[in-house]
From Swiss-Prot:
Superkingdom of the source species: Bacteria
Protein name (Swiss-Prot/TrEMBL): GTPase Der
Gene that encodes the chain: der
Domain EngA-type G residue range list: 3-167, 181-354
Gene Ontology terms for molecular function: ATP hydrolysis activity; GTP binding; ribosome binding
Length: 447
């Protein structure tokens, strides 16, 4: 699971700039979702081989009781609840403000691990810039510049260390083993995630366990189908009530991101009786960016007539065209129709994501693709694609070597992707293609 870091502070201290630097983006991967306030943003970042989730909040005024300021305070409190570590950002140029004291008092009462970061500290002596802020009682502050990046890596590294100290299970990375393929069923509220979970587990003996901690922790449900073990990762807020699991349907961005990262295969569940929303597309985008294997389930199919079904299929092609690599299943979790086929696609998607491809076969497919259609010339030169090999799995990565590869167009990249997908039957997994230009060993030789 990925550690969660929340950025908290009064308005205009540089939280959004720090957020963008941590996610290496001007527009976070996880942007605003419809139904969530614009003042709580989620993004994914990575320091070395350490991935994490970061939450940017609006300017925080804990004592606000009405209007937009109160709503921003509510959103910030929720971010603190979801976080493993809180970075409390203050402004080194303006110095300590009364509002900083109020925020510090609030954060102390939450019991969260808090790191104090003094932003805009570039060109300033640490001792002088830090002196004002010791009275907050937050320990030694970190001096950083979110604009220039000074001190940011050290700050995030320390935050991740604290997160693992707080929850050691964050350091564990588990692949499909004795518990089988891990499946995350994700989607917006009320699309039928909990019904699908109960349909999948049926009347079998179920081992359900709540990982220790708060509501941000996932529930894992183990079951068997056809003699194969599987583990479901809950994102619907399932809680056991006797022998059944009841849903507390509350959409959580953190839970969704955590479960996608933890899963081997993601099932994106849509509601056939509702239009595909921007939120559906955002969730689909999370999955593709994460590189996870994917199966799409369109639920409540039994309630539609022929005309309505045609409209839904057209909507899928138009709004979720970027998911064309995934199998789509039209199911009814309530009536238990189409579930077996969906689960078979889960197995196929996992197999495709973990496939090992021999270099000679990859190179042969590349050569056949180039022979059928060469890349376009760029100026006087044409990209030369010479050989290819596999560069990784989950998702599969194919590395193409050659010369002048910066001239390969996006359209030609998609053409190659389709050729590789067809040749190796890579259905259900993203496929990434990387180009590496060969070095000319004689380029630097002297006559």
């Amino acid at each position: 699971m990925k550690p969660v870091i929340a950025l908290v502070g009064r308005p205009n201290v540089g939280k959004s700039t720090l957020f963008n630097r941590m996610t290496r983006s001007r527009d976070a991967l996880v942007a605003d979702l419809p139904g969530l306030t614009r003042d709580r943003h989620y993004g994914e970042g990575r320091i070395g081989d350490r991935p994490f989730i970061v939450i940017d909040t609006g300017g925080f005024e804990p004592v606000a009781k009405e209007g937009i300021v109160a709503e921003m305070a509510k959103q910030t409190r929720q971010a603190v609840v979801e976080a493993d570590v809180v970075i409390f950002l203050v402004d080194g140029r303006l110095g300590l403000a009364p509002q900083d004291r109020v925020i510090a008092d609030y954060l102390r009462k939450t019991g969260r691990r808090v790191m104090l970061a003094i932003n805009k500290a570039e060109g300033m002596k640490y001792t002088s810039v830090a002196a004002d802020f010791y009275e907050l009682g937050m320990g030694d502050p970190y001096a950083i510049s979110s604009t220039h990046g000074d001190g940011v890596r050290e700050l995030v590294d320390e935050a991740l260390d604290l997160a693992v100290q707080e929850r050691p299970e964050l350091a564990d990375q588990e692949d499909a083993g004795q518990h089988g393929v891990k499946i995350a069923i994700v989607g917006r509220p009320n699309v039928g995630k909990s019904t699908l979970v109960n349909t999948l587990i049926g009347e079998e003996r179920v081992i359900a366990f709540d990982m220790p901690g708060t509501t941000r922790d996932a529930i894992y449900v183990e079951f068997e189908r056809g003699g194969k073990p599987y583990t479901l990762i809950d994102t619907a807020g399932l809680r056991k009530r006797g022998k059944v699991f009841e849903a507390i349907e509350k959409f959580s961005v953190v839970k969704t991101l955590q479960s996608i990262a933890d899963a081997n295969v993601v099932v994106l569940l849509l509601d056939a009786q509702q239009d595909i929303s921007e939120q559906d597309a955002h969730i689909a985008g999370f999955i593709v960016e994460s590189g996870r294997a994917l199966v799409v389930g369109v639920n409540k199919w039994d309630g539609l007539d022929g005309h309505q079904r045609d409209r839904v299929k057209h909507d899928l092609e138009r709004k979720l065209q970027f998911l064309s690599f995934a199998n789509i299943h039209f199911v009814s979790a309530r009536e238990r129709t189409g579930i077996g086929a969906l689960l078979r696609s889960v197995d196929d998607a996992y197999a495709a994501a973990m496939i090992k491809l021999p270099t000679p076969q990859i190179t042969r497919v590349l050569q056949e693709a180039v022979e059928f259609q060469q890349p376009k010339r760029v100026g006087v030169s044409r990209p030369k694609l010479r050989y290819a090999h596999q560069g990784g799995s989950n998702p599969p990565i194919i590395v193409v070597h050659g010369n002048a590869l910066s001239g390969v167009t996006d359209a030609y990249r998609r053409y190659l992707e389709n050729r590789f997908r067809t040749a190796f039957k890579l259905k259900g997994t993203p496929l990434r293609i990387e180009f590496r230009t060969n070095k000319n060993p004689y380029a630097e030789s002297k006559d």
